[in-house]
Amino acid sequence: MANLWNDLISKLPNPHFLQTHEWGQVKAKYGWIPYYAVWTDDGKFHFSQTTDSLSLITGQCVAAALILKKQVLSQGFAARLSILYAPKGPLLDWKNEHLRDRVLNDLQTVAKKQGAIFLKIDPDIVLGRGVPNNADDVPDDAGQAARSELMRRGWGYSSDQIQFQNTVLIDLSVPVNEMLARMKPKTRYNIRLAEKKGVGFRVGGVGDLPMLYKMYAETSVRDGFVIRDENYYKTVWRLFMQSTIHGQPSALPLIAEVNNEPVAAIFLFMFAGRAYYVYGMSRNIHREKMPAYLLQWEAMKIAGANGCAAYDLWGAPDVFDESDSMWGVYRFKEGLGGEVVRTLGAYDFAPNKLWYKLYAEIMPRVLDVMRSRGKEKTKQGLG
């Protein structure tokens, strides 16, 4: 039934790999319960823990959402309380006011019935394109209207943004030579430099996963960000690598090598005509040979060959200047010739404002402790 769900959501506006059956199965291994919500054109709303009943739905699907549920506590007075999250969902035509009202009404009812402290959504609703306050800044009126509707209904901009709100999107529908032409000259130069310096490239396999995690851990320690344990990433990578959606692989590890030694890698995810650069990693050696540039160029060509019309580089700054921690990464992505896309971000609906306030105050402290422990554990793992 996994393919049935994926087929269903792939026909909706802005389908995303974080809404796939595979992502629900990944999260199910780590304490989340996946629910599958479907709205049909006959006015019915289907909400189930499994996808088994999808084949029985008679109406045409007009909206859908993978909704993840997690209990806050396993016992005690708050054992019934939960949090709900629809990553990059719900999927629907947000310009359709009647459908939008219907979906939001049902989601708010679900949040109340499930005893949720909050329900978080972060659909790919575009608020604007280009860097804010620059000549290429183009606001999106439909996106602005959807945001206003959420706020009118009592949904609040979340202090806990799980996904990147802004990103860089590369158009893969143009010929390869035009993709190159859209890049900054320095980026094209670095791609040629990598080739000249003997940087090789290959598509990896499941056997490479231990090596790739070690490289990712090395990157996290060097660049100062926190990662999860090895089993988590192996679960995500293996599940998507072994899954095919519409005949194409869902994820590919792309590995750059110097003298047959891996020096950098990225994971390329693909779903419903869009590719995603989700995980990037590199060794501390041979960085002057620019393997990261060659990898992105190969990723663009592979994604295009697999029917993807766009490549999401997964993240751009909140503030477009050097004060933002993502500024350096953004300059690299900008050089690849993409367009900045600014989206809605995450909004929360909180049925119980008191519990929501308590959760919002306590959880950041818990996460700070967990991040500190996570950094130390990763360092120890590298020896």
Locations of regions flagged by a protein language model:
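Conserved acyl-donor/pantetheine-binding loop and adjacent beta-alpha core of acyl/acetyltransferases
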Residues: 58, 73-83
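A conserved beta-strand-loop-helix scaffold within acyl/acetyltransferase catalytic domains
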Residues: 1-45, 63-76, 123-134, 141, ...
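The substrate-binding groove and active-site-proximal loops of carbohydrate-active enzymes
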Residues: 87-95, 135-136, 286-287, 291
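Aromatic (often tryptophan-rich) hydrophobic motifs at membrane interfaces
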Residues: 105-106, 236-358
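Conserved GNAT acetyl-CoA-binding A-motif
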Residues: 112-130, 304-315
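Short Gly/Ser/Thr- and charged-rich N-terminal loops/segments
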Residues: 49-59, 247
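Glycine-/proline-rich flexible loop or hinge segments
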Residues: 81-94, 118-120
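Active-site/acyl-donor-binding loops of N-acyltransferases
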Residues: 26, 126, 133-134, 138-139, ...
